[in-house]
Structure formats: C-alpha cells, structure tokens
C-alpha cells in the first residue's frame, strides 16, 4: 500500500504576498497547512548594536528604517525614552505636533496595510485608491522634513522645526503638464495646517469608498470571515498588541490606558472586534483611520490658536537657534559640542512604549552617563504576531495563509531589526 506523506514548500522570500523578506516553510497535507515555520533574519541590520556606536541623536534616523511604513512613530518611542532619562519637559506645541504626525502615520500605515491585504487576496482597485491618499500625507511629511519617508523629524526635546507656512508646490515636467500641476497645487496654496484640514474634511468620504469596495463584498468576506481566528486568551498569551489584540475583543490601547504626550486631551474611541478573525481586524483598522482623522482635526484646531516653541530651551540637549548661534560665542560652542560630541544622558534605564499602528512599539534604553547608549532594546509588535503564525495558520488552506499574513500587517524592518 502506498504511503501518504506530507510535503513541504517554501512560501517566499520571493513571493509577492510575503510582504518583504518573509520565508515561510509550510508543511502541507494536500492543500491544508499542518505546520507553518517562519524563518526571519533576512533583513537583519544590527540596529540595536549600531546604536551603541552612535550618539543619542545620531540614532534617530535608524528608527525611521525599522518599520519603514510608520516612520515617525518609531522615532517617537525613541525620543520619549531619551526624554525620560533626561527628565526633560517637551513644549506643549511640540507634543501636539508629535501627536498629529503620529496619527497621520497611523493613517499612512493602515492605508498601505489594507490596500496590500486586499491586493494579496485579489482586489486590485483598493491599493490604487489608498496610494492616492498616501500621496497627500507623504506631502505633509515632505513639508516638515524634506523627505517623503525617512523624515528624522522628531528630536529629543521636541521636533526639528515648526510647521511651514507654505506647502511645497508641484512644477511642470515631462511627467506632468500645466493642467495636471494646476490641479495638484489647488489645495496646496496655504499652510500645512490648511492642507491637512482640507484632507481631513475629504478623508471620511474616502473611507466610505473603501468600505463600499470591501466591507460588504461577498468575495472579501468569504476570504476573511472565520479565517485566522484568535481568542482573547490566545491573543494575550501570545503577546499580541494593537489591532491584532483589539480585533479579538480586548480594548487595550496605550493612548487611553497609559496616555503619553497630549493623548489624555484628545476625544477618540477605541474600535474593538468581536470574533478575532481577519475580517474583524480589517474593520478595526478601518475605524482606527476615522478616529485618527478626528485626532488630527483636534490637533489642527489647537495648533492654529497656540503658537510657541517646538523644542526644549536647553542647549545641552537641543541646538540654539541659528540666528542666535551666529552672534554669540557661548551658543556657538553649545552648537559645536552638541554636533561633535553629542549630549550626555544621565545613568539609568527606562522603557518607553507608544501605541504604534501595528501595536506596542517599545524602546528599552540603558545609559551609563556617556554620549552613546550603553544598550538599546527595541520591542517590535510584529515579532510577536509572526511568532504565532504556526498556531493561527494550522488547519487552514494554503490560500488562507496569504489572508493571515496580510491581516498581521508585518514589516520586516522592525521584526529583523
């Protein structure tokens, strides 16, 4: 009699649904997954070790490159850790700017996550819509930092500079004619806050469009309802955070439970799922984008009425203004010392965590009083989610593995570090 054996296949790292460099070794019984073994490390760059050889501020750009879809949120956790070690008070305007850009980043992340998840399952229209909105928010990144992705905008003590009074303008080139440029620049005539206000007024309508495409779509529901079910007990035991935890019905959000910056002043709700499947996690992310839009609106209203400093007035931590530095020897010395030697952070250890779009992103920093971290440990939310891949995927069809990877919203910059 013939022996029936399971067979093993490699899913990725060249698979379009592997979201980067995931190598998944699947053991299959026919088309049913018996075991899923994630192999990570293909994007390991030694960020934690590199940080030990750089000054505290020089490591800020490394944070952008961890989860390279949620850039400013990574920076935020790192800056919070330094500020807690220093016992530094951040100006209130800088706190509002940080919260506003955290929520812009959350929208950016979820737009890409939902768009690519739908694309993986076979709904191509969605990703074309979401990239249209991402373009506007990337322009907001570019307006404050000059970069569309790796912004390096947050600093220990505040942010690099205040919000600009004018948006960057598109110009005619071989890809864009005069009419196209005129249309693109139409809502870019005012300040960044004007541009964002215009975006927030339009965005809920865009969310309705996405829901029209997916929420009641029969094929989308067949591919996501009842797939990748995680109970609340399992989610807690596996260390899930963010939409992966809230999709299972656990209302845990650091912005509400352990507020940082000015989140305690914000009016927003925490969307929570019921069934813990891929569909509920999708609904959570959709509603989170609407709530982020609410928070951005509140920040815009406050920032319009309250001008002020955007970085701490402590020249041992933040550089003096350029115009004062050029006329005062003492401030020139501060500037020189800060950019050559870097600031010295008092001895101690601290853990700072924020509600990152993917979950709890934490930075555990240890200082020995030098100008460089003694040790930096990064807690990436996607690491715990991917570790549960075997448990979640077992018993599903091979086609459902794609839906499960999409709902995890994994990015390997942060998982491999």
Curated annotation (Swiss-Prot):
Keywords: Cell inner membrane, Cell membrane, Membrane, NAD, Quinone, Translocase, Transport, Ubiquinone. GO terms for cellular component: plasma membrane. Pfam families: Complex1_49kDa. It is an enzyme of class 7 (translocase). SUPFAM superfamilies: HydB/Nqo4-like (SSF56762). It is found in: Cell inner membrane. PROSITE patterns: COMPLEX1_49K. GO terms for molecular function: NAD binding; NADH:ubiquinone reductase (non-electrogenic) activity; quinone binding. It comes from the Bacteria. NDH-1 shuttles electrons from NADH, via FMN and iron-sulfur (Fe-S) centers, to quinones in the respiratory chain. The immediate electron acceptor for the enzyme in this species is believed to be ubiquinone. Couples the redox reaction to proton translocation (for every two electrons transferred, four hydrogen ions are translocated across the cytoplasmic membrane), and thus conserves the redox energy in a proton gradient. Belongs to the complex I 49 kDa subunit family. NDH-1 is composed of 14 different subunits. Subunits NuoB, C, D, E, F, and G constitute the peripheral sector of the complex. This is NADH-quinone oxidoreductase subunit D. It comes from Aromatoleum aromaticum (strain DSM 19018 / LMG 30748 / EbN1).
